[in-house]
Design a protein with these regions (language model features):
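N-terminal lobe of the biotin/lipoate ligase/transferase fold
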Residues: 1-97
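Long, highly charged amphipathic alpha-helices
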Residues: 20, 24, 101-108, 112, ...
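Short, glycine/charge-rich beta-strand/loop segments that flank catalytic centers
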Residues: 40-43, 120-129
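Short, conserved charged micro-motifs
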Residues: 55-57, 96-101, 158, 193-196
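Short acidic (Asp/Glu) patches
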Residues: 55-56, 65-75, 101-106, 110-113, ...
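Contiguous, small/hydrophobic- and glycine-enriched helical/loop subdomains that border
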Residues: 85-123
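Long, positively charged amphipathic alpha-helical accessory segments at protein N-termini or as interdomain linkers
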Residues: 113, 133, 141-239
Length: 239
């Protein structure tokens, strides 16, 4: 049973730091604890655990533009991150894993801001039949991490420039159809902002469990070897 909630927001826009921090939060989740982690990456392609980078993105273009490529711990497809995207992570003991419940927190937060979204399939959220959020999960020891992207105002030109669309998708749907399936929330809700979304997510997180979301206890968790472990995890995503 969840008895304590934490909320953490990253001040870094560097993908290796953020993915390392997410892994640290997941690894250091105690019994009955749950952490909401909110973070953003600047000009980054994130590929799934088993993906071939050369097949999923145009590495030459990404490198030429000073972008970053990282491999996350979860499976799923390649995604493009910039500062128009918000990443949401739920770090929790495996015994308390509740993907539908955590997804509902995101939907509730969006509803607070006037956005009525719905689930599509196993891993997506959409509005009017167009996807703005993808989800994935990984498990690490006794802990679980469910993370999601939320496209608020992502640069669509960069997304199309760096990501390779599957030939099968192009063959079956066509370029225009593939583009039309993805939407920025700002296209429908131009006044929506990242800070407002972060506040709504923290409020919905707290309301879902009837508990206050405390600031993450960094001083306590980084004591002893904690700081070295965090740096080690961040370095792993840099290589």
């Amino acid at each position: 049973m969840i008895s304590r909630l934490f909320a953490a927001e990253s001040r870094s826009f560097a993908a290796p730091e953020n993915l390392g921090t997410e892994a640290f939060l997941t690894e250091h989740t105690g019994p009955g604890e749950m952490t909401l982690f909110l973070w953003q990456n600047e000009r980054t392609v994130v590929i799934g655990r088993n993906q071939n980078a050369w097949k999923e993105c145009r590495l030459d273009a990404l490198n030429r533009d000073g972008g970053t490529l990282v491999r996350r711990l979860s499976g799923g497809g390649a995604v493009f991150h910039d500062l128009g995207n918000l990443n949401v992570s739920f770090c929790v003991p495996r015994a308390e894993e509740d993907i539908p419940g955590q997804t509902q927190i995101i939907l509730n937060a969006l509803q607070k801001l006037g956005v009525r979204a719905s689930r599509s399939g196993r891993n997506d959220l959409e509005i009017d039949g167009r996807k703005f959020s993808g989800h994935a999960v990984y498990r690490q020891g006794a802990s679980s991490c469910h993370h999601a992207t939320l496209m608020l105002n992502v640069d669509r030109e960069s997304l199309e420039k760096y990501l390779c669309v599957s030939p099968l998708k192009l063959q079956s749907r066509g370029v225009d159809s593939v583009r039309a399936r993805v939407v920025n929330l700002s296209e429908r809700f131009p006044s929506l902002t990242i800070p407002a979304l972060c506040t709504a997510l923290k409020d919905a997180f707290s309301e879902a469990y009837g508990l206050p979301a405390e600031p993450y206890p960094w001083k306590e968790r980084l004591a002893g070897n904690g700081g070295d472990r965090l740096r080690s995890l961040q370095d792993r995503f840099s290589s």
